[in-house]
């Protein structure tokens, strides 16, 4: 399964993309659902973890409970330095779980813990987010094309 995470606009992108992988990207494409989940979608879990542990662990705790060896963690961060995304990427790497980073700028600290890095070389948050969605939609459309052949 795909496990997405991100903060703010990147959290919205994580939810958006998880839904499209699970349901579909294009209205006339009928394909099997792909297992995907956003770690940024459950406000009770996010706030309980932030309160009881620390905000830097809000993705790590659920990932530890839900992830399996064949999963893929997709971290989305326009700075590449979001501590909670960095912590879960490091943990995934330590467990030999594949990691993909949708990153901005030079990739920040997160780039060192991503098997695949999709970096947008900009410091403009809006442009980075637009490029992240474009890239993610392109990848999903390609996957859907393969699934319906």
Positions of the model-derived regions?
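A charged, well-structured terminal subsegment
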Residues: 65, 126-149
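Short beta->alpha connector loops at strand-helix junctions that form conserved
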Residues: 40, 77, 103, 118-126
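A short, small-residue-rich loop immediately preceding and capping a beta-strand
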Residues: 1-5, 69-80
């Amino acid at each position: 399964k795909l496990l997405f995470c991100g903060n703010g606009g990147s959290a919205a992108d994580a939810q958006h993309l998880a839904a499209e992988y699970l349901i579909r990207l294009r209205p006339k494409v009928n394909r099997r659902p792909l297992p995907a989940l956003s770690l940024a979608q459950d406000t009770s879990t996010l706030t309980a973890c932030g309160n009881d542990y620390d905000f830097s662990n809000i993705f790590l705790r659920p990932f530890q409970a839900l992830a399996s060896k064949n999963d893929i963690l997709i971290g989305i961060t326009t700075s590449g330095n979001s501590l909670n995304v960095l912590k879960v990427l490091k943990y995934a790497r330590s467990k030999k779980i594949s990691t993909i980073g949708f990153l901005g700028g030079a990739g920040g600290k997160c780039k060192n813990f991503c098997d695949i890095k999709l970096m947008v070389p900009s410091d403009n948050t809006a442009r980075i987010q637009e490029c992240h969605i474009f890239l993610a939609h392109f990848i999903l459309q390609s996957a859907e094309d393969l699934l319906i052949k």
